[in-house]
Design a protein with these regions (language model features):
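Elongated, amphipathic alpha-helical interaction scaffolds
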Residues: 1-300
Length: 300
């Protein structure tokens, strides 16, 4: 019997299963094309995509294996790597750069070769924030630049980061496809029905693909397991944050207590020195008794 206990109507795209269900299958590649084109804002238009192997090995056995969420190339042979960063990672920028080396290195050719490369795009959908300077700046596009002229030095390596927690627009505030896609990614698993603002054909297909009730038993079981892994991961992150805060608070209390004691002792020493000084005791003797410097005693 197919027993289904999940109450959500739509899949959570932050789960491994959910993300690959929506963006990692040939059947739904038009969803990925629409999403990528919304990110590029017309600077380039992707017409078609070919999915590539998401598992990559380094050039030696010592290299770490890299497994991408989605890896594909467009009709021009340009490589596009899409990663869903589900939890905060201290070195996610380093990870992005490391991942970018794989689609670059695999373009190498034996024999005579002029080293001309196809463009590489690394897209990171982040379920955390890394730029605390601005709450409104959530779409980062990073390229290699000349630090003096601020001009783009190399335009065929692009990193796009989306800080999803910063995107808080409501349905009635959505202005374009980019914002609509971010709204879907941010809210899909919480929605009970398709929002009126999302009437484009691509979203019709997305909501049909995302509906949990239409999953086969095998899909449902895979999603349930993926959701458990995601929730365990989130709980681990939250527990670590709480523990860190508690340790910081405890350390702060200890440090505050230490500072308070030191201030109290200093105050007593100054009162004693002031009293001895008033009685005409020599400065060097007061310094020896109180632990204060002669300069401090002279200033009393």
């Amino acid at each position: 019997m197919d027993s289904r206990e999940l109450k959500d109507r739509y899949v959570n795209p932050y789960t491994d299963f959910g993300f690959k269900k929506l963006f990692g299958t040939e059947m739904n590649k038009d969803l990925l094309i629409s999403f990528i084109n919304s990110l590029l804002s017309g600077k380039e238009v992707v017409k078609d995509l070919t999915y590539l192997n998401t598992e990559h090995l380094g050039t030696s056995e010592a290299d770490r294996k890299a497994v991408f969420d989605v890896y594909c190339e467009n009709e021009n042979g340009e490589k596009i790597l899409v990663e869903m960063q589900r939890g905060e990672q201290q070195f996610f920028k380093d990870l992005s750069l490391y991942y970018a080396t794989f689609p670059i290195r695999e373009q190498g050719q034996k024999g005579e070769w002029n080293y001309r490369l196809k463009a590489v795009y690394v897209i990171g959908i982040l379920n955390f924030t890394f730029d605390e300077q601005s709450n409104d700046y959530y779409h980062h596009e990073v390229k290699l630049i000349d630090t003096r002229t601020k001009e783009v030095f190399y335009d065929k390596l692009t990193f796009i980061y989306l800080e999803m927690p910063k995107f808080n627009k409501k349905e009635e505030e959505l202005n374009d496809m980019f914002e609509k896609w971010l709204f879907v990614l941010r809210n899909l698993s919480r929605l009970l029905e398709r929002p009126k603002a999302l009437q484009e054909r691509v979203f019709t297909k997305l909501f049909e693909a995302a509906e949990i009730a239409k999953f086969t038993k095998a899909e449902y079981d895979s999603y349930e397991e993926s959701l458990k892994v995601y929730r365990d991961w989130i709980n681990t992150i939250e527990t670590a944050k709480i523990k860190s805060k508690e340790e910081g608070r405890e350390e702060g209390l200890k440090e505050g207590e230490k500072i308070g004691i030191e201030k109290g002792e200093k105050k007593k020493a100054m009162e004693m020195a002031r009293s001895l000084k008033a009685k005409g005791v020599a400065i060097n003797i007061i310094a020896e008794c109180s632990g204060l410097s002669e300069e401090e005693i002279n200033s009393l």
